[in-house]
Amino acid sequence: MILLNRRRIMINPQDRSRAFNFALKMQDIFATFVGLSILWSIYALIFTQIEFIFISKVLLTVICIGFGTLTPLIDFNESHATNPLWTGHARFHLVWQVNAMILTSVLSIALLWFFYSVTNHLIVIFLNYLWIFSFYATVFGLKFFDGELNDINGVPPVLIKVFGRDYEIDRNIQAITGSLFVNSYAVALFFV
């Protein structure tokens, strides 16, 4: 588990813009939506005749919605794209990456729902894993380019309690790990 230190200066909501606070609130709401989607899928598997492929498509769509909406909400504010501590070139690459993620999400949803085929289903699975595994490759390579999961004025961590002990977990780790599990669940449903 990757834990964060406690040197964040934008923990207090009043230190952040309304847009940034809105993005963080939407991320929390979306996490609940993902949880409800998983519960729905379990219900659908046990109590309905809904095809596994359809459930897989819904779960992949949920991931795409997260990649295509939450990423720009979180990244297009003072924590990333307009972060005064970042160089203009770093911001350029961030916006480029986020735009690519948005376009990938739109393409994936179109492939799943408007141009469906088994091949397109597999392409969407692959595209989701591409974003997920490229994130983990970057996390594991942080020491090679002196990178960090978060900046001092970046996104605050998620606070969780495990066996009575408090932990701070980076929101990217939380979101991408959740995406990994949901995407893998969708893959299992696809191949059943």
Predicted features by range, described:
Residues 95, 161-180:
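Individual transmembrane alpha-helices with interfacial aromatic-anchor signatures
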Residues 69-75, 133-149:
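C-terminal TM-helix exit segments that contain a strictly Trp-centered aromatic cap at the helix terminus
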Residues 35-36, 100-108, 176-183:
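Core segments of transmembrane alpha-helices
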Residues 13, 70-94:
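Interfacial loop at the N-terminal end of multi-pass membrane proteins
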Residues 70-72, 91-112, 129, 133:
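Core segments of alpha-helical transmembrane spans in multipass integral membrane proteins
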Residues 187-192:
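Juxtamembrane boundary at the C-terminal end of a transmembrane helix
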Residues 46-49, 106-123:
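Juxtamembrane helix-break-helix junctions at the cytosolic face
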Residues 55-71:
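N-terminal signal-anchor transmembrane alpha helix
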